[in-house]
Swiss-Prot record:
HAMAP family: ATP_synth_alpha_bact (MF_01346). The gene is atpA. Gene3D superfamilies: 2.40.30.20, ATP synthase alpha/beta chain, C-terminal domain, P-loop containing nucleotide triphosphate hydrolases. Its main location: membrane. F-type ATPases have 2 components, CF(1) - the catalytic core - and CF(0) - the membrane proton channel. CF(1) has five subunits: alpha(3), beta(3), gamma(1), delta(1), epsilon(1). CF(0) has three main subunits: a(1), b(2) and c(9-12). The alpha and beta chains form an alternating ring which encloses part of the gamma chain. CF(1) is attached to CF(0) by a central stalk formed by the gamma and epsilon chains, while a peripheral stalk is formed by the delta and b chains. The keyword ATP-binding applies. CDD domains: ATP-synt_F1_alpha_C, ATP-synt_F1_alpha_N, F1-ATPase_alpha_CD. Keywords: ATP synthesis, ATP-binding, Cell membrane, CF(1), Hydrogen ion transport, Ion transport, Membrane, Nucleotide-binding, Translocase, Transport. It is a peripheral membrane protein. Its EC number is 7.1.2.2. PROSITE patterns: ATPASE_ALPHA_BETA. This is ATP synthase subunit alpha. Produces ATP from ADP in the presence of a proton gradient across the membrane. The alpha chain is a regulatory subunit. Pfam families: ATP-synt_ab, ATP-synt_ab_C, ATP-synt_ab_N.
Length: 545
């Protein structure tokens, strides 16, 4: 029988080989326990190493965000369905802070505040993950707002112009057309998008916070119908969502926009509306037992909005020159703009467009109150052509509103006042616009120029909108070269201005008012100065049968 021999070297090498290839199946992780839960908030004991804003994993794959870090427990906001979360369940750390996927594939899609698609069109291929709580651009990384962003709304482009990188507040009571103004601004970017020029293209983001599901579906349908959905992303946190989703939705939208901004691209983002975000944050804070302040809002509600809106900027050329323009919407109660949230956001933004319910009910739409609406960027964000023709429009409109209120109590008015009322009524009609019908800047300049020069004075007020629409259609044919010379908002002057005037004179000869009368083709009255007005014989209408 052969002798069995075992080499010690073979034994050693076999053991070494086994130990090197062995992978332990156990791991160390922190596990917490839900101590109580209600209304989308969970208190978790344990997890001593959890970070602020860290994602926590609850049973069933439900995620939460660690907001309150206390000695013995964590206060977390549950993102998603919280009905199944119960006391005693285990909670695990993920090691990740809150972030969302971003990229060009998000254009044309509807996502929730976690960046997950909810439009039934399949998964979205992300380019990268972007942290939600990201520091805004520093002062040295910015440049002044000087590049205009046309909204297609004559009243805004002429009176409270918006520039790329600006934050312009849209404020007013419910049902005054706030959302419609912002949707029109998105629709007006279609012409720039179709050029294919990256310096002109504007990517749009519409953030719906606490809106009815049917309202969000209506916005999506309107964008789709007008061909604007291809360059727009919708971030939806409808009224049925938890307070956590409504709180996060604006930050998700801004993270998607910042991704493009830091690539040197231009972005327009609409927050509809931040009042509901503040109310959701108030609910979260009260449930987390944070001390309430004015109107029961927590002490950091100003920071909630300031750190969001400060992300809108026009970056310096060294940073790529990209921009993100913000249109936050705030809903007021009974036109009270002195309430807590409205005053907070007014102080953060670069101006506001105030929509008034009284004007809206009178049929003035968009119902913009010229007296309380302002752009702190001012003429820097206007094209040269618009700045020239609309320079005195704000003053004229303010004087008209004041005189209109006075005339309600006065029976006899002098010629100057009558002339101002007649001209003001025509300005009001010109600034009215139908929904989803943005006006190109060239058409705006020509219309304002002709009213300013007195060409609309002989047209009955009730026919102004029809006259303006038919005149512009005719001018695009008969004075096409003049329109080409003011493309991009160039100044209307010289031969182009004379061609517009001549074509307008010719058009007026064939225009019939609604009562069948012909508009007299009188010489342009020009701007109505005080000395000229006093010597001017003013009548209510100039028509000849």
């Amino acid at each position: 029988m052969a002798e069995l021999t075992i080499s010690s070297d073979e034994i050693r090498s076999a053991i070494e080989s086994y130990t090197q290839s062995y992978t332990p199946e156990t791991s160390i992780e922190e596990v917490g326990v839900v101590t109580d839960t209600s209304d989308g908030i969970a208190h978790v004991s344990g997890l001593p190493s959890a970070m602020a804003n860290e994602l926590l994993e609850f049973p069933g794959g439900v995620l939460g965000v660690a907001l309150n870090l206390e000695d013995r427990e964590i206060g977390a906001v549950i993102l998603g369905e919280f009905a199944e979360i119960e006391e005693g369940q285990q909670v695990r750390r993920t090691g990740d802070v809150l972030s969302v996927p971003v990229g060009d594939k998000f254009l044309g899609r509807v996502v929730n505040p976690l960046g997950q698609p909810i439009d039934g069109l399949g998964e979205i291929e992300a380019e990268e993950q972007r942290v939600l709580e990201l520091q805004a651009a520093t002062v040295l990384q910015r440049q002044p707002v000087e590049e205009p962003l046309a909204t297609g709304i004559t009243a805004i482009d002429a009176l409270t112009a918006i520039g790329r990188g600006q934050r312009q507040l849209i404020i007013g009571d419910r049902k005054t057309g706030k959302t419609a103004v912002c949707i029109d601004a998105i629709l007006n970017q279609k012409a720039n998008w179709e050029t294919g020029d990256p310096t002109k293209q504007v990517r749009c983001i519409y953030v719906a916070i606490g809106q009815k599901g049917s309202t969000i579906a209506g916005v999506k349908a309107a964008l789709e119908e007008h061909g604007a959905l291809e360059y727009t992303t919708i971030v939806a946190a409808p009224a049925s969502d938890s307070a956590g989703f409504k709180w996060l939705a604006p930050y998700t939208g801004s993270a998607i926009g910042q991704h493009w901004m830091y690539q040197g691209k231009h972005v327009l983002i609409v927050f509809d509306d931040l009042t509901k975000q503040a109310e959701a944050y108030r609910a979260i804070s009260l449930l987390l037992r944070r001390p309430p302040g004015r109107e029961a809002y927590p002490g950091d509600v100003f920071y909630l909005h300031s750190r969001l809106l400060e992300r809108c900027a026009k970056l310096s050329d060294e940073m790529g020159g990209g921009s993100m323009t913000g249109l936050p919407i705030i809903e007021t109660k009974a036109n009270d703009i002195s309430a807590f949230i409205p005053t907070n956001v007014i102080s953060i933004t670069d101006g506001q467009v105030f929509l008034e319910s009284d004007l809206f009910n009178k049929g003035v739409r968009p119902a913009i109150n010229v007296g309380t609406s302002v752009s702190r960027v001012g003429g820097a964000a206007q094209t040269k052509g618009m700045k020239k023709v609309a320079g005195s429009l704000r003053l004229e409109m303010a004087q008209y509103r004041e005189l209109e209120a006075f005339s309600a109590f006065a029976s006899d008015l002098d010629a100057a006042s009558l002339a101002q009322l007649e001209r003001g009524a025509r300005w009001v009609e010109l600034l009215k616009q139908d929904q989803y019908s943005p006006v190109p800047v060239e058409d705006q300049i020509v219309s304002i120029f002709l009213v300013d020069q007195g060409y609309y004075d002989s047209v009955p007020v009730g026919d102004i909108r029809r006259f303006n629409a038919e005149l512009l259609e005719d001018l695009h044919r008969s004075a096409a070269d003049a329109f080409k010379s003011i493309e991009g908002g160039k100044v209307l002057e010289g031969e182009a201005a004379e061609a517009i005037k001549a074509a307008t004179d010719k058009f007026k000869q064939g225009f019939l008012a609604s009562d069948g009368s012909r508009v007299v083709n009188e010489a342009a009255a020009g701007e109505l100065g005080h000395e000229e007005v006093e010597s001017l014989s003013v009548t209510r209408k100039h028509v000849e049968k």
